[in-house]
């Protein structure tokens, strides 16, 4: 049966290529002109005469000793085989050369080494050189895919063999490996050649250093070959220059950290220059308090963890007078002995004025208040003489009105354990209605409650040397959490008084200060009457809603009645009216409380009669407001 294709029966719409026809042609099985699978397989005379009509056997190539059967097949009249024929012998020799090059890290030998007496090495080196030139692209692809460590010395050796300065150093290596290369065509040459590389790398640098630098410069080909030039003494200089650059890069982020912290929490007096002329007094107070807290915190961080052991060497810094040195020693030792059990102590900034009168005079007026003098000496003893003199010079410049406000500023130092809280919470922030950051709540069993200086409603100026002026609420909470880590905490607080409130409003917002001043003028002109009212507490409450309070939308306002609910007992009795200020509720003062805290007090009351003290304005301001509304 004939399996050959009939040319007349072909489909005109489907074209069959010649290679597919040859696959099914019976001539393929009889065609002797195919290339042999084995390069050294001998051809019979009968096959040779069939493949060649002239009767001449195929000639051998003098270079590689393989029969050129594929050339005679092109000349024959027989149909050619498919294009996927077996690979010729020269390609197999090139594959052997690639394997030898992968196992040999020394790369190509010098062309001048062809005059060697061994004929066998000449036969194998010839195809190897040709294979390296023709298959360099394949070698690069294979090295790119593998990224093995054995390929890196191969590239480095190839780079070295092309340089004229490295030719002299590579010649003795090529002569030494020339005889061995002819006999070791497989992978057996790898164990004898690879261990020799670290011996040459060690004089210029350790192998660990080269492995650490290679990934950093392996992105581009020219820099990637530089680490392997360590085998030559001339190539080690540029590599050693890379070391200081790497160290500079590693030290870069470390040097930037203090600057970032300084920018995020400014502690210097640069803030006083940015404020307005009306805010000079408050800015001076902020700068002085920040300097005191930062100086005290800096000295505490320089001391050991135990403060009792560290206060004694700080006393000679302050003790400038021989007459007061004994008193300071006893005071500091007394505070040092109680530091383990005591929660802390505080210093009023007004005590700095006493040091302006003279550092050499002993103050006998403070003997009556020995505890405050003792705590003041303990805090001031932590400051160095330069910092103390600088603070004294700034205090001398202040006027009398500003010096009076120093009485309300306290520097409190709390002794605690690592990870313990300070015992109070914060309220307010630059992003909230209440711009000033104040103490929201003092916990009953906390450190601040045991020490006694920090009270609810006090303004917090700084914590551990970090100023809270102009910070947001989240930033203030982050500073408060950071104060858990050290064993000591330095908190600068300011007691808010009626005189200091307008100053605070002017520093935060000029519009808010203007509205506050207008409200004060209205309240002063209007006459107010105080009433005592008894209401019935039900499950729904007292029957009215509140507005105002500390930290409200319009600032710190008194708690007033906003709206009276319909159907409540208070509506029927008409004892209270919208706008009445609540002064006292069931014996609890309502001044300085937020609206949320006032509601918590109302919810905690039992059901029954509740006594409320309210303050109601006269009818004259109400009539004016009604006329203005109309």
UniProtKB/Swiss-Prot annotation:
The modification Phosphoserine is found at residue 220. It comes from the Eukaryota. Residues 410-495, 532-617 form the PDZ domain. Residues 129-143 have a biased composition (Low complexity). Residues 321-343 have a biased composition (Polar residues). InterPro entries: IL-16 (IPR020450), IL-16-like (IPR055287), PDZ (IPR001478), PDZ_sf (IPR036034). Residues 30-268, 316-343 are annotated as: Disordered. SMART domains: PDZ (SM00228). This is Pro-interleukin-16. GO terms for biological process: chemotaxis; cytokine-mediated signaling pathway; induction of positive chemotaxis; positive regulation of inflammatory response. Interleukin-16 stimulates a migratory response in CD4+ lymphocytes, monocytes, and eosinophils. Primes CD4+ T-cells for IL-2 and IL-15 responsiveness. Also induces T-lymphocyte expression of interleukin 2 receptor. Ligand for CD4. The gene is IL16.
